[in-house]
Each structure stands twice: as C-alpha cells, then as structure tokens.
Amino acid sequence: MNLFASLNQFSKNRISWLLLLLFVVFFEGAALFFQHVMMLSPCVMCIYERVAMLGVGGAALFGLIAPNNPLVRWLGLAAWGASAYKGLALSLQHVDYQFNPSPFATCDLFVTFPDWAPLNQWAPWMFEAYGDCSKIVWQFMTLSMPQWLVIIFAGNLVALAFIVIAQFFKSK
C-alpha cells in the first residue's frame, strides 16, 4: 500500500505530468524522425495514432496546470485515459491491416479531420498521410511500428490504472 500512497503523492507533483509530456515529445519526435529523416511515408492510421499520442500530451499539459487541484488532476487523468485508449484501438486496427490484409478492410486514402480543425492543412509536414497502412516499412526486434504502439499505449493504460487506483489512498 506504500506504493499507492507514493504514486498518489507523485501524481500531485508537476514533475509527474512533465515526465508524461516528455514521453510524448520523445515519441512524436521519433515519428517525425522516421518521416523526415528516414523518409518513411506515414499512412492514415499512423497520423491518427500520432493525434492520439498528442492527446496524451494535451492531457499532460492540462495536468501540469494545477496537479494539486483534484478536478484538474482527474480531468487530466481522464483525458490521458481516453487518448491512450483511442491510440490502443487505432494501433490494434493498424496491426490488423498489416497482418490480416483484406481488400474489404482497408484504411482511408486521405486523413479526415473535422472542418473546424483541419490539421493536415494547418501542418501538412506532421499530419498529411501518403503511405500504405498495410505495408510494413520498419521493424525493430521483429515488431512493426503499430505493434510497438500497441505496447506503448497499453503501457500508458497500465500506468494510468496504477495512478488512478492510487488516488484512493492517502498521500504520504
């Protein structure tokens, strides 16, 4: 139970939210490195997964505002959970496109963002897709990029679960 009390205290500290933000910056930087340096074309699913990761970053920024305020902290945790869950669902679907190809199950040809937030028009260098979702263009330790994203987003949800449980324990 000491672990949960420590996690509760840690979640009320700006450093915890800053670490989450740095995690997102690292992975977004890696995505841009793959795209612009290694010249790997991002697909539609890659862009949606990138947006989900940015959602985790937005949650981290929100939590940074006032981590001692329970409302702000819980809203940050909820946004983190929603973004990580959406990222996991997208990554699992992307893995399915890669390893169970079907002419009936394909990703869109173009990214579709709402009219009020056309990210691919505002920042095409980051949000424009021109790759094929079913192609495996990169692997590390025999896992494709979407498989790594499944691990990353699932890891986020596991970490989030521990932190949410810790909210019900008294701080040290």
Curated annotation (Swiss-Prot):
Keywords: Cell inner membrane, Cell membrane, Chaperone, Disulfide bond, Electron transport, Membrane, Oxidoreductase, Redox-active center, Transmembrane, Transmembrane helix, Transport. It is found in: Cell inner membrane. It holds the Pfam family DsbB. GO terms for cellular component: plasma membrane. One of its GO terms (molecular function) is electron transfer activity. Residues 1-16, 68-74, 167-172 are cytoplasmic. Disulfide bonds join 43-46, 107-133. It is a multi-pass membrane protein. InterPro entries: DiS_bond_form_DsbB/BdbC, Disulphide_bond_form_DsbB, DsbB, DsbB-like_sf. It comes from the Bacteria. Residues 34-51, 93-147 are periplasmic. Its main location: membrane. The chain crosses the membrane at residues 17-33, 52-67, 75-92, 148-166. The keyword Electron transport applies. GO terms for biological process: protein folding. HAMAP family: DsbB. Belongs to the DsbB family. Required for disulfide bond formation in some periplasmic proteins. Acts by oxidizing the DsbA protein. PANTHER family: DISULFIDE BOND FORMATION PROTEIN B. This is Disulfide bond formation protein B. The lineage of its organism: Bacteria, Pseudomonadati, Pseudomonadota, Gammaproteobacteria, Vibrionales. The gene is dsbB.
